[in-house]
């Protein structure tokens, strides 16, 4: 890392180990950057200038699983503050869509794409009414999720009603829940399409045993005790899917992220069910992909640093 006086890039993050491959790639390229763990930050709304001309957001929605004092909403306000002072905050624009599965599904529908049949509630008492017209089994999901958390399957209306009475169904840290038809994954797999700059980067076929909802493909996820045994292979989605994914991330203002979809085994349709504003990239990328996407990301970061520097000189 560079000295504070020579910083071109600040990387703002929450997880202590996920971004070591990125930091190593930045070191190899000689980028003048600073690591900024969110847990250590405070800021003054009347001051607190940006730490660098370019800031990279690496905020994970799953942060609430690791600390009840999570930084999700803190980071949104901080990034807007820095943007107001002229900083280029990469992927700050992704936080509103990343922090709400309801917003994601609304956007998917507005663009004419297919997601799982879903209803949105903010009170447990409304769960059964929301499920009317949906086929069981249903899933209840927290609106803000991550790493497959906050998802419970209910096979019939009686078990859903019992959960509602107990107040035990999942709810997001924002107080919002989704009631969603369970769409069985064809061949037990999902497809995760990674994007950069609003364009296709690569895709993975992720296969898992059983009905786990934790399908995170990165090293740090796979190493967790109790994590699902996943099989990941590079995959080339049909051009029509790539087109939909690119439209979706561009409309969502996701500069770096991914989209997940499955083939619904009931009718063979592709259903997009998740937009991720944070990508850890695949474990062992050279073996799985034949290239390291961290290097591609750093190429773009260097371009953004140069572009921002030129804009500053011309101002």
Specify the residue positions occupied by each region the protein language model found.
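Active-site nucleotide/adenylate-binding loops and adjacent lid/helix of ATP-dependent enzymes
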Residues: 2, 10, 48, 79-85, ...
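Short hydrophobic segments within beta-strands
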Residues: 10-12, 196
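Conserved N-proximal alpha/beta basic substrate-recognition cap immediately N-terminal to
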Residues: 14-117
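Glycine-rich phosphate/pyrophosphate-binding beta-alpha loops
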Residues: 147, 276-288
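A long amphipathic alpha-helix within ATP-dependent nucleotide-binding catalytic cores
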Residues: 214-269, 296-314
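Phosphate-binding site of ATP-dependent enzymes
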Residues: 152-249
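Short glycine-rich anion-binding loops that position phosphate/pyrophosphate groups of nucleotides
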Residues: 60-64, 144-145, 278
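Protein kinase-like catalytic core scaffold
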Residues: 138, 201-202, 257, 271-274
């Amino acid at each position: 890392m560079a000295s504070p006086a020579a910083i071109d890039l600040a990387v703002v993050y929450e997880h202590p180990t996920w971004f070591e491959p990125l930091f190593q790639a930045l070191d190899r390229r000689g980028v003048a950057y600073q690591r900024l763990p969110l847990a250590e930050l405070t800021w003054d709304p009347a001051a607190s200038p940006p730490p660098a001309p370019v800031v990279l957001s690496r905020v994970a929605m799953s942060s609430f699983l690791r600390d009840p004092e999570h930084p999700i909403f803190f980071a949104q306000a901080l990034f807007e503050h820095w943007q107001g002072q002229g900083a280029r905050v990469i992927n700050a624009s992704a936080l509103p869509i990343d922090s709400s599965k309801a917003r994601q599904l609304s956007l998917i529908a507005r663009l004419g794409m297919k997601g799982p049949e879903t209803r949105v509630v903010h009170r447990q008492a409304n769960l059964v009414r929301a499920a009317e017209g949906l086929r069981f089994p249903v899933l209840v999901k927290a609106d803000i999720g991550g790493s497959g958390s906050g998802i419970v399957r209910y096979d019939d209306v009686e078990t859903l009603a019992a959960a509602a009475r107990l107040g035990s169904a999942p709810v997001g840290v924002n107080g919002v829940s989704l009631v969603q038809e369970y769409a069985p994954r064809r061949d037990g797999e999902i497809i995760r399409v990674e994007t950069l700059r609003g364009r296709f980067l690569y895709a993975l076929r992720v296969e898992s045993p059983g009905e786990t909802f934790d399908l995170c493909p990165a090293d740090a996820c796979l190493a967790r005790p109790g994590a699902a045994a996943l099989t990941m292979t590079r995959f080339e989605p049909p051009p029509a899917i790539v087109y939909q994914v690119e439209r979706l991330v561009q409309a969502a203002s996701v500069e770096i992220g991914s989209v997940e979809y499955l083939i619904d085994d009931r009718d063979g349709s592709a259903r997009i069910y998740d937009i991720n504003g944070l990508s850890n990239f695949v474990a062992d990328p050279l073996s799985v992909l034949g290239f390291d996407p961290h290097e591609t990301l750093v190429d773009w970061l260097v371009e953004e640093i140069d572009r921002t520097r030129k804009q500053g000189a011309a101002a």
